[in-house]
């Protein structure tokens, strides 16, 4: 489960954004 409305196959520990990529599992900045 990734952040955002839509799941992403390539999730990275970067900043979570809703509405536009990247959708990440763990929000840690931008």
Swiss-Prot record:
Protein function:
Alpha-conotoxins act on postsynaptic membranes, they bind to the nicotinic acetylcholine receptors (nAChR) and thus inhibit them. This toxin binds with high affinity to both fetal (alpha-1/beta-1/epsilon/delta subunits) and adult (alpha-1/beta-1/gamma/delta subunits) mammalian muscle nicotinic acetylcholine receptors (nAChR).
InterPro entries for the chain: Toxin_14
Tell me any Pfam family this protein matches: Toxin_14
Give a short account of its post-translational modification: Contains 3 disulfide bonds. They are not added, since framework IV presents two different connectivities (I-V, II-III, IV-VI and I-III, II-V, IV-VI).
User: What cellular component terms from Gene Ontology apply here?
Assistant: extracellular region; host cell postsynaptic membrane
Q: Which UniProt keywords apply?
A: Acetylcholine receptor inhibiting toxin, Amidation, Disulfide bond, Hydroxylation, Ion channel impairing toxin, Neurotoxin, Postsynaptic neurotoxin, Secreted, Toxin
Q: Which GO terms describe its molecular function?
A: acetylcholine receptor inhibitor activity; ion channel regulator activity; toxin activity
Task: Please state what the protein is called.
Answer: Alpha-conotoxin EIVB
Quote the record's domain comment: The cysteine framework is IV (CC-C-C-C-C).
Found, by tissue, as follows: Expressed by the venom duct.
Annotated family: Belongs to the conotoxin A superfamily.
User: Which sequence positions carry the modification called Glycine amide?
Assistant: 30
Modified-residue entries (4-hydroxyproline), positions: 7, 13, 21-22, 27
Localization recorded for this chain is: Secreted
